[in-house]
Swiss-Prot record:
Pathway: Carbohydrate metabolism; tricarboxylic acid cycle; fumarate from succinate (bacterial route): step 1/1. The keyword Oxidoreductase applies. It catalyses: a quinone + succinate = fumarate + a quinol. Part of an enzyme complex containing four subunits: a flavoprotein, an iron-sulfur, cytochrome b-556, and a hydrophobic anchor protein. [2Fe-2S] cluster binds at residues 80, 85, 100. Its EC number is 1.3.5.1. This is Succinate dehydrogenase iron-sulfur subunit. The gene is sdhB. Residues 1-23 are annotated as: Disordered. InterPro entries: 2Fe-2S_ferredoxin-like_sf, 2Fe-2S_ferredoxin-type, 2Fe2S_fd_BS, 4Fe4S_Fe-S-bd, 4Fe4S_Fe_S_CS, Beta-grasp_dom_sf, Helical_ferredxn, SDH/FRD_Iron-Sulfur.
């Protein structure tokens, strides 16, 4: 008989409770996933009571308040605070999103914050993005041309050619979509996932790129591309309102056209 076991330190336990001593006008409890691999202990869910009347409107504001005033060991990424850099991607209230643009008022009850699913956790809310970025590098996300670079101008593009990149170039590589995709959970070692495939199509669709055929040939692989089963979690969760599933469909259509289908 097979003996099934959970990996070491995989059971999430109840952690510390930090209660506010002063009277609060707008009390709210924030529950945060905590994990430090250096301690060789199970992850925990720590609870923090904060006064929303003394913090900003976004979830990131609450995290910064907790780190600055309650527990300085709380670890998370953040930078722009404008939904541009993608640093503060995490799972909030069951949905992958950006903490800096997620309004607290949209969340009912306790605010529950976890790191992005599927990825190895570096510490607390910080996921290891190494594999994700390696996959991004594999699609060669830069302009590949055969003609020499113009000496006195940039490579020009028509207005219509530029419009084809709308809904693609805005991707900030936050990984919210890829880590919400069950196909990526199951086959993340080979399947590129929605974020990387959207980025791949961004270069395929660029009228200035001369290597469309080569890019499509590289993606024509049972694992890299065709593990997409149109579950649509990617489109639902994208904090920028993009549609990775549509981009994946476009790639499949172009490959089919190359085979006369």
């Amino acid at each position: 008989m097979a003996e099934l076991r959970l990996p070491p330190n995989s059971v999430v336990k109840k952690g510390k409770e930090h209660k506010e001593q002063e009277e609060m006008l707008k009390p709210r409890k924030v529950k945060i996933y905590r994990y430090d691999p250096d301690l060789d202990e199970n992850p925990t869910i720590d609870s923090f009571e904060i006064d929303l009347s003394k913090t900003g409107p976004m979830v990131l504001d609450a995290l910064i308040k907790i780190k600055n005033e309650i527990d300085s060991t709380l670890t998370f990424r953040r930078s722009c605070r404008e939904g541009i850099c993608g640093s503060c991607s995490m799972n909030i209230d069951g949905t992958n999103t950006l903490a800096c643009i997620k309004p607290i008022e949209e969340i009912s009850g306790d605010i529950k914050i976890y790191p992005l699913p599927h990825m190895k956790v570096v510490k607390d809310l910080v996921p290891d993005m190494s594999h994700f970025y390696a996959q991004y590098e594999s699609i060669e996300p830069w302009l590949k041309t055969d003609s020499p670079t113009p000496s006195n101008s940039e490579r020009l593009q028509s207005i219509k050619g530029r419009e084809k990149l709308d809904g693609l170039y805005e991707c900030i590589l936050c990984a919210c979509c890829s880590t919400s995709c069950p196909s990526y959970w199951w086959n993340g070692d080979k399947y590129l996932g929605p974020a990387i495939l959207l980025q791949a199509y961004r270069w395929i669709a660029d009228s200035r790129d001369d290597h469309t055929g080569e890019r499509l040939e590289d993606l024509e692989d049972p694992s890299k591309l065709y593990r997409c089963h149109t579950i649509m979690n990617c489109t639902k969760t994208c904090p920028k309102g993009l549609n990775p599933a549509k981009a994946i469909g476009k790639i499949k259509s172009l490959i089919a056209e190359r085979h006369g289908v």
